[in-house]
């Protein structure tokens, strides 16, 4: 490709709404162009990167035995109603009507459609296993689309779906796909972690996220440096506390804490460690009638240590708390006789369901709210001042330094960007949609399923967050829009420069190298700045002075300076670099 034929559109400044590095650099490098909130055109330079991603993903999916198809972007609501997701999914699911008033959805995933295909086409155990995948446009109506391709509303995703005859073979299919994901991300040259994850709205009971390590990542990744343990924050656990509770040493006392409504403020006032305080979080669950009206509300009080944060996913998995919400101020006042900030488990006006974090269950002489403004209770002890807690659970997010649940050290936390996710679904969708096959005994069985996603358009953005400097993007070879750029200096003035550039360009093309020749006639400084911003890994500069000495200049995008190379050696050098 010659630059004069290509579409190159770089900017000196990023748009004001670009927050993260990848959004700024992809916009400045002319890879994406914003059309609307969370909706971007993939410009030619950006599309080349996306096609590289698709190619490697497609190769590894095919290698893993998956078969490609394409399913519709717009899908009938009836299929989604079979699984209940048409009603249960929030506003992120874009619902539309056609001219006849029929309901449709714009696909965020395609479990329903692929299960419908399977139930129509797969009749016997002899047809299993099967693995189908697509690389297709998706849409999620994000409330706050941001960060460019990192969290857009329209995006491209690879989604695969496996069908097996039993649980054992389904989990084997899961492992085949997880291994394929590792090969994919290894080929991209990214630093990543595979971490245990919660299955969330997709369903199932076995799940891993693939996270690119980046300081700007939205997700917290928890891992143990001394073992293989790794999980996202939603799933991560610390080693369960053990040992006898310390004997009480303090008297139960109502203590004035004027204007101190947070655990941190109370700890500072009383000059005690924050971990001696206990915070009270009030939740509510509603029972609805057939019309959707609330007929009963249960109030819950959760007790956590003052320096810990509630893990909403863990709490939502507790019996009775699947659909919890935070209680309103009137609900809190009706049960506690006090506004938030001074709440505690004693002296309630109405009973609540108490749930105690397992750390709090082992505490002695702790501090909590007195259910009276400007007062807290100090010296609180289980068994003496309160009955022993009946419901104890892990309610919190882990923190760095917690003991690893495998007993192999302490936990550390780093930031990451999710680029892939694998799920073992079991029979959640096949049961809901009656997708059965006849087993070896001629009896109908529900198909065991898995689903596997990769964010095709998110992956380049994640790669940039991990690979950039003050000059621009630094693409790994496998992702670069072009792997080599040739920069002739004033070829219109020096025929030997043009001839040498054309010769090397032709040799590289013949060798199958993804090369671009910059024949735009730009000044050297502007030309170099463009390619450093765009992030092409290998640059060769060809100038008249160097040619007279039989030399050209080679510079890798990560190098701070160029290296002189003999004209006759540059082709071999590039071949060696590209094979490394």
From Swiss-Prot:
A cellular component annotation (GO) from this entry: cytosol
Keyword Cytoplasm listed: yes
Disulfide bonds listed in the record: none
Coiled coil regions, renumbered to chain: none
Domain of life: Bacteria
Chief localisation class: cytoplasm
Cited Pfam families: HGTP_anticodon, tRNA-synt_2b, tRNA_edit
Top EC category: ligase
Keyword vocabulary terms for this entry: Aminoacyl-tRNA synthetase, ATP-binding, Cytoplasm, Ligase, Nucleotide-binding, Protein biosynthesis
GO molecular function: aminoacyl-tRNA deacylase activity; ATP binding; proline-tRNA ligase activity
Biological process terms in GO annotation: prolyl-tRNA aminoacylation
Enzyme Commission identifier(s): 6.1.1.15
Keyword Protease: no
Assembly with partners or alone: Homodimer.
Family to which this protein belongs: Belongs to the class-II aminoacyl-tRNA synthetase family. ProS type 1 subfamily.
Protein name: Proline--tRNA ligase
Organism: Albidiferax ferrireducens (strain ATCC BAA-621 / DSM 15236 / T118)
